Amino acid sequence: MWLAVSLVVALSVSGSSAVCPCTEERLCQPVQNEHEFEVFVFDVGGKAWKFYDWSIVTTVAAFGKYDAELLCYAHSKGARLVLKGDVPLLDIVDAAKRKAWIMENVNLAKRQFMDGINIDIEQAVEESSPEYHALTALVKETTEMFHREIPGSQVSFDVAWSPKCIDKRCYDYKAIADSCDLVFVMSYDEQSQIWGDCIAMANAPLNQTLTAYDQYMGMKIDSKKLVMGVPWYGYDYLCLNLSQEGICTIPEVPFRGAPCSDASGKQIPYSTIMKQINSSASGRLWDKIQQAPYYNYKDDKGTIHQVWYDDPESISLKAAYVGQQKLRGIGMWNGNLLDYTDDPVVQQQSAEMWNALIQKQHTASITVS
């Protein structure tokens, strides 16, 4: 079923010889077609990709070790495979160093027959600082270089769930979005800075999430540049106290100036959540205000925990907004976090998560209040 990887074709890349790892030379050519709707998957390594829903996947960002078999298979399905791009901003304030970083990644993409780069820089930046201007220039120059050297390539940039200097990431979001092919909005970790009560809350509350897209579009960023990122993981919080109303008070862990944050909790994959929820004290609960599921359980020491996560119901509500607002697409962090074993129950659970990405885009109406 899976394409065999064999060294069969030699191609010239950047003046040196790179050997095509696929059984057919055409599978080493950059993907040229533009997808009207993007389903953007982050992959962190291993072979989970063999179980992705390739009927909808359009781009895979390879955040794990390079996998030639994944490259060949993605290309056989018309999907792009793109590099991860990360660099300390202090290293690219200098224009010459910036150009060297870009060329290094262009040449790497060529050697590996890849289709572009996802720039994932989540560092704190002060507005109008040298780093602020360097980051904007980096995205513009990277896009220009990739487009010139690898026709059809895609350059994307990951942004925080809101443009309001989240975690002190004060970027020139409008200029960045204008200069690259798309921006992946990381609509998760929305409790990274808690300024109010230090309590467990949803990873991506619906109204807060959608309001942030209105803010991005209010900056005159084209909706067709925005890909909504949803979480395939949740947060497990230890409760210092669980009130009668179900409010879980959590330990204070400061982050970038805020007195409390989701760093108080532990990230857990959806696959683990599905195993744990049936034996939990509460079973699945639903918060009508945040439009998100959660549950409570006791650990081996008798300590109460509260877990907030996203599931097909909460993701479908967000996917509906994607269609209503005609965003560029939807994606997730990350594709590896589902259970892809052969148990029929978990297979159904995983299929429902994939289906939630697209099933209600054009039928449901979401209003931000």
Predicted features and spans:
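Active-site and adjacent substrate-binding regions of carbohydrate-active enzymes
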Residues: 120-144, 151-161, 306-368
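Substrate-binding surface in catalytic domains of secreted glycosidases
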Residues: 103, 123-276
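Glycan-binding loop/region signatures in secreted carbohydrate-active enzymes
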Residues: 21-37, 41-42, 230-321, 343-369
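Cleavable N-terminal signal peptides of Sec/SRP-targeted secreted and luminal proteins
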Residues: 1-18
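Alpha-helical scaffolding within the catalytic cores
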Residues: 44-48, 65-70, 100-105, 164-173, ...
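Conserved, mostly hydrophobic/aromatic
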Residues: 60, 119, 183, 228, ...
